[in-house]
Amino acid sequence: MFNNITDDDRGQVGIGTLIVFIAMVLVAAIAAGVLVNTAGFLQATAEDAGEQSVNKVTNRVEVLNTHGTVGGEEDIDNITLTVRLAAGSDAVDMNETSIKYLSGDSVVTLTNQTVTSGANSATNDSAEGVADSDEFGLSEVTDDDGSFGVLNSMNDRYEVTIDTAAIETSDGDNTNLIGGLSTGEQVTLEITSRTGGTTQVILTMPQQLAGKTQNEPVEL
């Protein structure tokens, strides 16, 4: 009628409870380790993403001024931009910078093929050091430390030259030129550094070039 409870029975129940408790502790420890590792991975990933985002915003150039050069057909044959580092930017290597050129008739990505030929001078791979249909030219205005091609000081100034006459061609090369950018035409330039920082410039050609002579500079 009554169950007899012995000391042996109570001991077996105690051991079972202890085993379950130890197993729960081990599972909790493993789970905690996984959570710590996951949190560390997520933190590192977030830091990398944040650094990349900052670079895209800060590591870029600033365009100080622009002008065009009048061609022989009352158009703009060349565009020149004076650039420097944007505020807060780290060094920008113009040799690893690209420019997307977009007009009403043409779209092309330009790279810098300028090579140094001395401490503070440069010549372009193209004829007579002039940019062509897929390259932009680069020349020094000021460069305190002689590191031509790399903007690494707020005092550095370079001129970027884009040959619009070569780009706006009928056959995609430097033959059969049909002129540069016409009066009133608009062109968009996106200057992108190696880290992804982008500066956009939208330029509109003068509405009229009457009285302007060939090779005369005009403000854009």
From Swiss-Prot:
Record key words, sorted: Archaeal flagellum, Glycoprotein
Key word Transmembrane helix present: no
Phenotype of the disrupted gene, per the record: Straight flagella, mainly at the poles. Cells lacking flgA2 but not flgA1 are hypermotile, display an increased number of flagella per cell, as well as an increased flagellum length. Cells lacking both flgA1 and flgA2 show defects in motility, whitout affecting surface adhesion ability.
Glycosylation: residue positions: N78, N95, N112, N124
KW NADP (keyword) present: no
Post-translational modification remark: Glycosylated by a pentasaccharide similar to the S-layer glycoprotein, probably comprising a hexose, 2 hexuronic acids, a methyl ester of a hexuronic acid and mannose.
A Pfam family recorded for this sequence: Arch_flagellin
Cellular component, GO annotation: archaeal-type flagellum
BP GO annotations: archaeal or bacterial-type flagellum-dependent cell motility
Superkingdom of the source species: Archaea
Pro-peptide positions on chain: 1-11
Alphabetized GO MF terms: structural molecule activity
InterPro entries: Flagellin/pilin_N_arc (IPR013373), Flagellin_arc (IPR002774)
Subcellular location: Archaeal flagellum
Function statement: Flagellin that plays both structural and regulatory roles in flagella biosynthesis. Does not constitute a major flagellin in terms of abundance contrary to FlgA1: may regulate the flagella-dependent swimming motility depending on the relative abundance of FlgA1. Not involved in PibD-dependent surface adhesion.
Family: Belongs to the archaeal flagellin family.
Protein name per UniProt: Flagellin A2
Species of the source: Haloferax volcanii (strain ATCC 29605 / DSM 3757 / JCM 8879 / NBRC 14742 / NCIMB 2012 / VKM B-1768 / DS2) (Halobacterium volcanii)
Taxonomic lineage of the native organism: Archaea, Methanobacteriati, Methanobacteriota, Stenosarchaea group, Halobacteria
